[in-house]
Amino acid sequence: MASTQCFLHHHALSTPARTPLVRSIVPSLKPNQLLVCRAQKQSAPQEDNVNSVSVSRRLALTVLIGAAAVGSKVSPADAAYGEAANVFGKPKTDTDFQTYNGDGFKLQIPSKWNPNKEVEYPGQVLRFEDNFDATSNVIVAITPTDKKSITDFGSPEQFLSQVDYLLGRQAYSGKTDSEGGFESDAVAIANVLETSSAEVGGKPYYYLSVLTRTADGNEGGKHQLITATVNDGKLYICKAQAGDKRWFKGAKKFVENTATSFSLA
């Protein structure tokens, strides 16, 4: 009676040996192991041995197919249960932002923001704004300076006092008393929420988070994030902002990522 037996070999062929019946049909193979199946003829039919040890030709073929599946490389499109399959086998990319490379600088801009030609500040070279809300925008301004480093302006708060035009100037100059914590005759206020400094590429940077409010309560105020540095006699400023209401409805992510992504190129 003919039967088929499978033997596991390493680099060199070894003497086949009978092994007891195992529960798993497909063996675990390492890259340097080879599964060999050969047919042998038994001298006499032994039903017990056939039932416990012998492997039928059909089962041997199943073993080979299973072993091939184990040894094959899993494609990127395969996914475990409960996971989404990447059918094209390509890594996912963040489509929420696009890279902008300017003259001496670079930053990440929200993909849904469009360029705008409006010039609001001295030295402004770039402006992008939200398609649906112009209050959410980013500008980049480059102006000459005699400072060698951003730290020559003093602390971040002292620097802000020298570029306070970024926060908008009060146009009203009459007598008034507004509620909401405004000083007498003032219709606008700016609160510095956070300041920090860091060194990127050997250059110091200032980061400031400012909340500006007006007496009319428009948008509940504006969150303005400023990134600034100095290089080769030029002051680089990036300011990204969003209205207070939209800030807490998802705009925070886009404004923060845009402002913190700014750096010299």
Curated annotation (Swiss-Prot):
Gene Ontology molecular function: calcium ion binding
Subcellular localization: Plastid, Chloroplast thylakoid membrane
Cellular component GO terms, alphabetical: chloroplast thylakoid membrane; extrinsic component of membrane; photosystem II oxygen evolving complex
Keywords assigned by UniProt, alphabetized: Chloroplast, Membrane, Photosynthesis, Photosystem II, Plastid, Thylakoid, Transit peptide
SUPFAM superfamilies: Mog1p/PsbP-like (SSF55724)
UniProt xrefs under Gene3D superfamilies: Mog1/PsbP, alpha/beta/alpha sandwich
Keyword Transit peptide found: yes
InterPro entries found in the cross-reference section: Mog1/PsbP_a/b/a-sand (IPR016123), PsbP_C (IPR002683)
Segment annotated as transit peptide: 1-79
One Pfam family this sequence matches: PsbP
GO biological process: photosynthesis
Membrane spanning residue stretches: none
Superkingdom: Eukaryota
Keyword Transit peptide in record: yes
Induction line: By light.
Role, per record: May be involved in the regulation of photosystem II.
Family note: Belongs to the PsbP family.
Protein name: Oxygen-evolving enhancer protein 2-2, chloroplastic
Organism: Nicotiana tabacum (Common tobacco)
